[in-house]
Design a protein with these regions (language model features):
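The feature marks the mature, well-folded catalytic cores of soluble enzymes
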Residues: 1-258
Length: 258
């Protein structure tokens, strides 16, 4: 994956400890298979792995970034602002097509950009949360229109993706019951819009420090908010530093798994 200037976690020349990566991947796979969801495992794309090393820019792939799903069989293939990553989505589209999913793409001549990591879709509430850093507003609106959502909530920031500063929380009935966000990393108008949204929906907004998200230029965060929300579960990499999150999740009947 190419290095982004707005992702402080990416450093030139840093190589992950492969033994730890394999252990963590194995643990995550076992966990996912224990949850009430269907898990599909795929091999690392041969094309990306075997490409000329002088040209190759992919050591890993964030699958979540490659498409946006309406959770009912339709997938919008990401149109990346970073052109070097587009091949990832191209390959993923082939895989999704082979699985029988409906895949659609933003027209090539459109200026809209939309990346999977910039979205959270809550189908039971017909709400689409969208970032506007790697996305642009036109891309967020294109996805919202394609999914025919009732409400689009755009959060502008300089953070790499929305999933590095925000996550929705959904209960066992797949209903949106809270949101967790690092509002200090968002633009003022986006914070105000989010506050109005939660007030209208009568749900809780837990404001977390940058350390629970992507962090700042001076200090890398722990990415606790970088979660996979599932009905009744919130799966993430680590516990939140904020002491407000755990009590709320317990009250809502949502299990936080790290």
């Amino acid at each position: 994956t190419p290095i982004y200037k707005n992702n402080p976690a990416m450093k030139e020349g840093v190589v992950p400890n492969q033994e730890l990566v394999e252990i963590e991947m194995s643990m995550m796979t076992k966990l996912m298979h224990q949850l009430p969801i269907e898990v599909v495992e795929i091999d690392f794309p041969y094309f990306l792995d075997q490409k000329n090393k002088e040209q190759r820019q992919h050591d890993f792939v964030f699958v979540r970034d490659l498409f946006v799903s309406n959770q009912n069989g339709k997938m919008i293939i990401s149109k990346f602002s970073e052109k070097a990553r587009q091949v990832e989505s191209d390959i993923m589209q082939i895989m999704l097509d082979s699985m029988g999913y409906e895949t659609i793409r933003i027209p090539h001549d459109s200026t809209a950009t939309a990346e999977g990591g910039e979205f959270y879709y809550c189908p039971e509430d017909s709400v689409l949360f969208a970032g506007a850093c790697r996305n642009n507003v036109k891309g967020a609106e294109w996805v919202a229109q394609e999914f025919n959502v009732e409400e689009l909530v755009i959060m502008k920031s300089n953070a790499f993706h929305i999933d590095t500063l925000f996550t929705p929380v959904i209960n066992k009935k797949n209903k949106l019951v809270a949101v967790i966000a690092c509002t200090s990393l968002m633009e003022k108008d986006s914070v105000e819009n989010l506050q109005k949204f939660v007030k209208r929906k009568n749900i809780e907004l837990v404001d977390i420090p940058p350390e629970d998200g992507i962090g700042t230029d001076n200090e890398l965060g722990e990415f606790a908010v970088n979660c996979q929300p599932l009905p009744g579960f919130l799966v993430g990499p680590t516990r939140f530093r904020s002491n407000k999150v755990a009590p709320l999740l317990k009250e809502l009947g949502v299990m936080h798994i790290t």
